[in-house]
């Protein structure tokens, strides 16, 4: 495939084709990925999101990589659902440091009926602040998905994690088909999809290819594809797993960019472990989204000022979205906070 040829969006990738991409010489692969990237995106713009854990710990799932699983002793304190106003305050702070999307994550197998009203209020409030909204709450029913869409949720994150073949080695409490069903519900409800996976769990190159095939062969590509590098947490079964080779990680980003040319490819968890040179290679490979702030749910993330310093050195600017004038935006913040303060949901969220 010529690096400069026009790229058509495909949904029929085969393992042999994706293997061939992975097996290219490193420079050829990066050149092809960067060429594809430039056909659809400004190469010097990166979308910036902030992630907040709105409910931490004691998750009933047994994901072997996750410090929030109740199956493992990782020293993580269990926390109740965060109050709506605190979520809105965190969103306003994220906005102030340059984030355009606010992502809220809860350590649940699925949201309960009693939690949904608070979650919906969070979505509505963050939207009023002028931010895009994203949530990751676990498995959803069709009714819950529709309610989130009606509240104004822009993105729903539900990662596939790895290939179907390797998946059973990592998670036994939820099936791969259940994950795909949730993604189908999200798409049917008219929301955008954020879905990717994790590298460094002991998977093979074919498993990495298999993950990308599952994502790229969906009826519509995910708008956002987070590629995570395993953050090894003491107490989890993967705490002693071998490190991912940095070049293998960059290769996966590049292949994701080629296969899903119009998606934002997010350099996600594990960035704290990457030096500036590796992050620069990631942007060259087509990564054009990051999480911004000091924490990703429960693990460290590069500090915001370090990110902006690196952006400046590389000539990168945060991706912009249409904004209200400052005074209109400030009024929206104040109004949203007042509405949440006056709501019964505001008072009861923490004890629900």
UniProtKB/Swiss-Prot annotation:
GO biological process: biotin biosynthetic process
Binding, [4Fe-4S] cluster: 59, 63, 66
Coiled coil: none
EC number(s) stated in the UniProt entry for this protein: 2.8.1.6
Needed cofactors: [4Fe-4S] cluster; [2Fe-2S] cluster
Cofactor, how bound (note): Binds 1 [4Fe-4S] cluster. The cluster is coordinated with 3 cysteines and an exchangeable S-adenosyl-L-methionine.
UniProt name for this protein: Biotin synthase
Source organism per UniProt: Ectopseudomonas mendocina (strain ymp)
